[in-house]
Curated annotation (Swiss-Prot):
Residues 82-175 form the PH domain. It comes from Drosophila erecta (Fruit fly). This is Diacylglycerol kinase eta. Belongs to the eukaryotic diacylglycerol kinase family. It holds the Pfam family DAGK_cat. Residues 1855-1918 form the SAM domain. One of its GO terms (molecular function) is zinc ion binding. It is found in: Cytoplasm. Residues 20-37 have a biased composition (Low complexity). Its EC number is 2.7.1.107.
Amino acid sequence: MAHLKLDTLHVQRSPRGSRRSSPSSGRSSACSSGSISPVPIIPIISISHDGDESESESEIETEPVRLFQRRMSTKCTNNLAAIIKEGFLLKHTWSFQRWRRRYFRLKRNMLFYAKDEKCDVFDDIDLSDLCYFECGIKNVNHSFQIITPTRSLVLCAESRREMEDWLGGLKTATAPQRPRGDSFLIEQHDILSNHHHWYATSHARPTYCNVCRDALSGVTSHGLSCEVCKCKVHKRCAAKSIANCKWTTLASVGKDIIEQADGSIIMPHQWMEGNLPVSSMCAVCKKTCGSVLRLQDWRCLWCRATVHVACRPQMAVACPIGPAKLSVVPPTSVHSISTDDAWDVASPKGNFSPLLVFVNSKSGDNQGVKFLRRFKQLLNPAQVFDLISTGPSLGLRLFRHFEMFRILVCSGDGSVGWVLSEIDRFNMHKQCQVAVMPLGTGNDLARVLGWGSSCDDDTHLPQILERYESASTKMLDRWSIMVFEKAIPVPKTPKMSISTEQEAMLTGMVTSANHHLRFIVETNDTQTLISSTRNLCDTVDDLVCRISEHHKEDEQLAVKCDILRQKLNMLLDALQEEEIGAHSGDDLIATIRSLITRSIPVTPGSNAYLLNPNISIEKTEKDQINTKERRNSRSLRSSEKEALQCRANSVKRAIYNVVEHSEPGRPKRYQRKLSITPFEALKLPTTASGESTPCTSPLPIIPPINIISPTMETSRLTCISPLPDTRRDSVDENFFNSINLPAPRQFADSRRSSGVPEVIQEIEEGANGETVYRRSRMSLTGGANIDDAGNRLSPCSDGGENTPTERKVDFLRVPIHTGEPIVDPLCDYRPHEVFERTYYMTREMDKDKEKDKEKEKEKTAEIEEENDKCVEKLGSIPAEKLVHTCNLQVPGVVVTPNPQNVYSSASITIIDTDAQTTTEQSSSDDLGGEASDVLSAISNEECSVASEIFDKQDAGQTVGDIIQNMDASNFTHIDSPETSDETEAMPGESLMDDISSVLGHDITYALQDNTLTDDTTTLCSEHAGPPKPPRKKSLSALSRTQAHPRRRNSSPPRTARLARMDSDDNPQQFGFENIVFEIDNRCDDQKMREPPRYCSLAQFVEGNDIARQSFKQLMLEQHRGGDNDIESPEQQQAPTNKGAHLLATTSEDELSTQTAIKIEIHDIDATVRSINSSMKPNTILTTSTSPTKKSGHGQDISVVVRPPTPLRGDSIKPTVSLLPVSSGGAMAVSMTCSGMLGVRAMNASEIRRHSSHAPSLAVREFDKDKDRRHSGFNPNQLTLDPEHARFLSSSPAASRRISCGSLFKKKNKKIATKRSYGLFSVRFFVVAEPDFRLATLALIRPLIPLPNEALPNLQTLKGSKSSLFMGSTLFGFDHLASAERDKEERGGKDKDKTPTEEANRKLPIINPLVRLPNWPNLANGGGFISKCLLANADTLCAAVSPLMDPDETLLAGYHEKCVMNNYFGIGIDAKISLDFHNKREEHPEKCRSRARNYMWYGVLGSKQLLQKTCKNLEQRVQLECDGQRIPLPELQGIVILNIPSFMGGTNFWGSSTKKDDIFLPPSFDDRVLEVVAVFGSVQMAASRLINLQHHRIAQCQSVQINILGDEEIPIQVDGEAWLQPPGMIRILHKNRVQMLCRNRSLELSLKSWHEKQRQHSISIQRDASSTASEHANSTDEVISERECYVLLNFIEAVSSLVKWVKFLIISHPALQHDLYEVACRASEALESIHPQGKLLEGPSLRTKLVEVIDSSRQLYDDACTLLRDRGHSLILREDLETKLSAALANMEMELKKCSVQKCIDGKLRAYFNVLAPNEESDGRRKSRPFWVRLRSGSTAGQQVFKPPLTNTREAANNWSVNEVVTWLETMQLSEYVDSFLKNDIRGKELLTLGRRDLKDLGVVKVGHVKRILQAIKDLSEN
């Protein structure tokens, strides 16, 4: 029934069916479809008959079969089947060539379409026999055509991407069903199926269909062409074509496989019939083949050989593959696809370097489509991939099994980065080499690699492939862009809300306030400033009033509104300060003052009773001092501008805080970007269940600032900069809102930090329901509880009411023990930022201030009395105990043991200055009243070296213990928690990075910084501390704490002291890191009851990383055991001079006026022996070699040591005398002296570890005229507050463990002993005026080799740039380096630097312009201790082996955003790129040409010139190069270059015309980045024309950029731009990839070699074949007429030569007679070819002529030799000489026409060239142009020497036709040889050929004509 219906349908046709040919025509080849009927199987489909819906084609073709059937509903079918793709497309209609929008739905083997997606009736098309193709090369309208046996649809998509999606969907719909239906198998099926890939095209000549063999219709022969094999078909015949496209794998070769006897497979030819190129020549018969009349002859798809049908059997079986043989993957080599989706490859014989090609079809205005098709025609289609459709992964997976292959990326830089990222993913760096073909616009990488800026023509692609085959390899550095972004969460529960109208009004107010703030910061107009300021105040007042009306009961909101008023008041103050100098007394000042008066807050006054009366929000004296300092700044205007910017940001943030609190559901830009609020960080449990304390007040419970909550997101627990040894003096206040970072330098003051020990009031609910207020102090140091009066409490105090849980709360708070009532220590110096934070904690404190002062006085008097008693007790020590000790006059200085954070040995002492243990106190935390000192103790303290020297050490250790530790053989190292049996798991960090980073840090700017920071503790101590004292206020503890010199502070002195607990249970003694660990790991009561376990020490086993045998240090037992031990540190004090005034307290005012203290050390060994006489013998191991021997030279070293001071150190000049002495007990005396002084002395070398964030110490000679702040010294400078320690806790730069044992060897002891004479005899003079540099010298003196010391590394010390003492004005070693420099300058002034010297330059290399006054002053360089380490790196690093990868944990919290190959930009350049990207996405048709894109870039750059959207970028970002902060001028962008090409070919770094002594030459394979400043769009434009260099910033190996504020900043990487939110960006080296660079020298060499080989082969072929045109039509035996003419001339020449040679011999009998015999032999041979006067005929003549030619050539050679040898003595007649010369010349010409060849039968035959003899050369020369003659200096009257005319033109002018033919064949134009031979074209005619002449010769191809004319031009010019 179905067949009957089909036949019936076949009869029903359209009225236009008459135009249709017979349905069976052309279907004979389609019988393989399986159809029984001769007619096609046509399914029942429904087609619309609307007049405007009828289909049409672009050519006149027969109408497909039309079916008139009732349309049925397809709703059920559509709902059942799975939809592959659906959407709207434009359908081309027949009427008026219109497009109609239709909805298409694609399913398996079916396509449905209707007017709308909701229609129930869809037209359906069967896709079982489908053909689809694109409708154009460029595909401007993104159209494609679908052809089935019954339908033909032309569809158009909105974009090329959508069109390719539809084509891919059609491919999927028609692909056979497979078990694994992923995209890989679909793409694999497409590669291996050998199906044609059609596209519509036109042809310039008659073309014939390969299916029906008929001509394509139309004048232009419009039809379909396969983009791979160039098969031509009609559109109606496309579905009938067989799948015989170009082979891809061995399976596709099929029956054509040829296998040899040995089993190897030969690559056969793959023939395609007809449509041959013009002038195709048969490879067998060398005749023209192909036709324009019919489909005939064959061409190979691989080697491009063409043959006749008759000559094809004679063709060689094996295919040579063609000119690109080296790059082609033969299909016979690809056997199958293995299980890992890669080819199983059998490498072919010979050279083989497969080429994997990736083409971006969208690049270059879709020019990539042409290249994609061209590559598929030249190579194996399976090795060419479209990046748009398949991406790089498919090709890389298939090529995975190739040992080595090349990759060619035809696209821009973005696609190159895509491919390189996929190579990273597959880890294929070692097996592939990447080349780039420039398509599109972004081709900076291709330009640098030598491949040019564009490649638009695909006609020379074979030659281009040869260039890539001869390319060389270079390594390209690739850089990871690591990003850490700030979290932007949404509040969980909304607090309040306002109506929609009020919300709109609120938004408008905030926008208006921001607008006015921007005007205030940026404008320079006074009137605008006044109006903006007044409007801002009005807007803020209106905002506060409206919000307060709707939220009257919200007390916190009222506080925030008051804070907003305070911030506005501070902004007005800053405005007044800025303008008071230039506008004193004008309207602006008056306006601002009136606004200040009006803006005074109201709420704080009403709630003043809630606040601590000590807390003040008024401007303090220090603020005025800072203001005065800013006035004296050399960068006054920029500093004031920055201050104003900070104040404006503060006001802006306060506005956002108010809005956020009133409306938590606002947009994200109004929300503070905090992952968790500070108040939610930690809930202190007060009940057994661990729940938070009930609180009736809105005040939340504040956690201790030193404790990291386990609820804090770990993604934020990272340091601001993990880079080592980094200095940060200026961080914008809104960088991280939850972290108080250092303010800019103008506002950086230790009194302004929020990280202070704050007084909080804990509100608890008592047992009877009453409210209990408990006040506590939070601190980083301390472990005991205190009562309301500040007294120390025992664990069971508080009336016994405290439960264990409450004690746990007290433990978590870790309050400090104070000797005074609780008051705010920063009462007079707290700024408004701190006021905001401390408001909630202190608002209900109402202690009486006068009462606190009285208690303070009482406690001070009591302390002084106890100290006097201690001093008297010390004075009673027997003198026998200290017989030979030093004469000591020190107030309250004790002999302290090796502290817990000191690890010492015979060669090195490591001091952890970050460790804040119970036995170590910072330099000022005992001064409770000193605001700056207390803050420094809690945050990052900045102190001088002298304060470090005299730091107090609690519960000390004896000198013997120190010496024991020095000489102990069991050196240990800090065991990581994961390897220790006594510790719990810690976050995986180690101190190794600290030391390793310090050792690797460059100190090019050595000794330029002068501050050392004690940062948050991270190094855990191994010392368990002294025995537990009774839990009461200990006078001895107080005295130990206070009887200790401290650094003086400029603020008013306070006598209150803050002591620390010395309990064993105090977790602080084990370091802050362990507290963090314990808090994070104790979440229930059971864990809280467990005893804490801390990091122990483990033995270092050589050859291993960390030993597993952990144990405590031996000094514990030595310290505790024995009655002979020294009883207390007080008893270790030295006898004092009776005349000296000993102070019982350490009041700094008294210390500053104290008299000098003289310390004399005469006998070191005796001193050590007497000091340690009471200790156990086995604990003393001295280094003395001669105990009773005095110093060898008898000289002393006198050092004047001044106590530290925050004042400038240049007020009193130091007097230092260094007298070298030598003794064996150097180290002993060094440690003894330092121990008695409480000094942490260095034993030959000392490591003082400090945080990577800390500003560190360096020695610098300050200028008197400079302010201390501009010299980099500010004792109140801040770095990071303790809250930021949460980041440091997970930072490997702050907490890494180092294997100390790996640093020390036994040989180091000997070296240290030899070099440790620096403190043999030392006199310390402590005078009233302090200077910290001399104390520094006293410490590092053992490190300094004296000039007369014979050390092997002395030259290294003098020559190294990173030497500690070079360039220092303190140590006086500059003369060594200066002498060397002078010597080098005299010796090698004109010598260039060697590559080794360039390689030895230390990075980062920073532009000296950074030091100029117009750049901001920012202290750079590493710390003092790190520079000491670098100076002695040879000793320290002798046995160091890295314990881990330093980058493993450096990037905690970071993620890789992308990878940089070319350049990175932030600011204006990224903004321009982002705008261009948006423009291109919006209007792609406007950005399709390279010239238009350049215009768009110019327009967008000019727009930025006016708008300046990236103005003041230096205020929004911070730049660090290799860990060093770089000060930034006013700029709009920063560019980081990896290649010397930027945004379209600009050499933005600038080329150096001379040898650059500062920077290294830029290169993309040196692991170095170039950092450049962008000042504006004008500079970017000028850099294309001018070689700019002043904008260079630095060269470095890593870069970090901190984005401040809350706004996004445009960023671009390799031209791809986006908006980056605030956070941190790190650029680190990722890997290197092999890139192919163009090698022009190799190309020229190969070209010349190929030409020689070609000419040689052509000459051989020419000798083996006849050169005359007649030879092709006649046999070799017959002499032609022209040859006969040449033969007669030859006979005449031979006869003449024989005649005159014989006459010469006869005339001169003395000559050789053998020449006469040769002449006779030649005469006889000549007679033999014409016996009896008749020439021989037939083949014998050519055989006889061989003998004649040989004899005549011998006669010619012998005659020439004779005349050359005897010509000077031979006297000839004039006529004989002339005739003999003419005969020889004629003979030479005739011999050139002769050739002897060996024939097939083995006989030699002679042949003659029938061409005319060479004519005389044209001696005329074209006159040179006038300017050439003028430059050469020749004039008309001068005789100019003319060289011999042997140039190419003269040689070509003498060419014969044979040589012209050879010249044609070298240019691969052998098809014109016959034409040149027939027309007798010689060299002279060749040089005059024109375009018309070439056309007459048959050269009709335009390309051939141009090539010949260009070659002729080259011959003429050369």
